[in-house]
Amino acid sequence: MDHVSSLPEGVLCNIFSFLTTKEAALTSILCKRWRNLLAFVPNLVIDDSVFLHPEEGKEERYEIQQSFMEFVDRVLALQGNSPIKKFSLKFRTDFASHRVNAWISNVLARGVSELDVLVILYGAEFLPLSPKCFKSRNLVTLKINSLGIDWLAGDIFLPMLKTLVLHSVKLCVDKFFFRALPALEELVLFAVSWRDRDVTVSNASIKTLTIKFNYYLGTLSLDTPSLVSFCFSDHVAKDYPLAKMEKLSEARISLLVTEYQIERARAPNIYWVEDDVVLRLVNVGKLMKGIRNVQYLNLSPNTLEVLSKCCESMPLFNNLKSLTIESNERRGWQAMPVLLRNCPHLETLVLEGLLHHVTEKCRNACDCVSQEEKGRSLTSCQVKVLEIKGFQGTTKEMHTIKHFLEHFPCLREIKIHMEENGPTQLRVPEVSQYIAEMMEHYEKSSSCNVQLLVGGYLCKKWTTQ
């Protein structure tokens, strides 16, 4: 007998758990002793692509879809009431089937702790999931993709659920739905289609919240007092009536905007006082107020531009230690002066690109426009470490670095990461030599250590003697 065949049944079942369910079924027929092991495999990974072969156009054939569903029925029947830990289902069909709800009910009744379901219904928007299925004391992780959820808070019972991921889901729930998940710690809302445009996420236990690319979003209310990590990459909501995130430690805000919204953001206020587009941008200030206790903050180019409409309502970020700002030449730094002044304890500033859209409203944060009070917004900033990424070696960038050296009073270290993939002047020997000379010149007139890095490794260092 070979070594694999002599392994204990528990070990063999664990090995089978790393295979797709079809692979496990095919493997089990190789040895007489293995034939019943599929009944005790604790992890079922069922993917219809190994049956339907969509790359060959067979997924639309009715008989193949029927064969797949019959296979799932047989596997679940074979397992009977044996305990199950994980059930993953990926299924494409062109007709709604009650079987999906039956399969989910089966594994929930057997104590499944991790459930991952993707069902694509051809010719219709979403396959509806029955709330009657979702009553379980054991479910810890639930991932739902491309399905319809029309539930009320009282319809479900998931007291142990810690992770909920909703991807491309049609969501028809009331404002109490998330509150009905008492153990929830991680919530992901990705490309969700909301029935009600005014969305409320209310939960006392959530620690990590991700909201990306949602549809039909009107107002957004966040009542998440235990939230620690927040990632928001979405269209600007109409309003943020509630943003309760007192324990927030890290946040990434990446607003999705149209060029029309940017145009209106840059227009003089006097012309758009009553304009709904501008009011929507101004209301972003309420979201910023909600994240004011954050220690680590990342802002996209769009977000920084939108914040130019929130300067008067910009909160104090008293706890902020590290600020990362992404830049590109199509978006401006108008909000930079106010933002830096409102971060009194900032220690690390990371600029992912120095090039940005130049406007007179950049004021004294950069060297783009000559100002009588140049650098005034920087002199009160306590930044000790400045990290610059995507450095291309342009004269404009060099002037900006010089500006920072002259006006950040507490600056002790600058890390400059050279651009490796995009355009750069640093591959030209004459330019590279000029930059080296300028860096040495800057260093002599400051108390700052300057490092030029390539691929994260030190290329050149100028250290104060």
Swiss-Prot record:
Keywords: Leucine-rich repeat, Repeat. SMART domains: FBD. Residues 1-47 form the F-box domain. LRR repeats lie at residues 97-122, 141-168, 198-224, 229-255, 296-327, 328-353. The keyword Repeat applies. This is F-box/LRR-repeat protein At1g52650.
